[in-house]
Amino acid sequence: MCIRDSLIVDRGDKREFCAGSIAKIFEEIGGKVIYFGKPYSPVYNLSAKISNKKVLCIGDNMNTDIKGANNQKFDNLLITSGIHKNELNIGSIDKLEEKYGVKVNYIQTKLKW
């Protein structure tokens, strides 16, 4: 079971392989992987059951976070300081959306609790 489909993740200044990379290799050698998490619908269905209010999906990955939100028709917030930071500059959100086949609703540089 793979609960994080992302291939890479940024941890501070370091870019590291994520669980999705291991799952992909396992599939390539014939293994069966069950995915749970973004962008797959079970995690979003669970979110919708928890609250009947509007859901906002927040993340930095176009392939998982934003794609999953789009698939479920939920609003999303792209954190631009994440894994796509080197692909982004002023006015490039449209190009990034086209490249990944997704639609971003809101953007923010960082998320701080």
Short names for language-model regions:
Residues 4-113:
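Asp-based, Mg2+/Mn2+-dependent phosphohydrolase catalytic module
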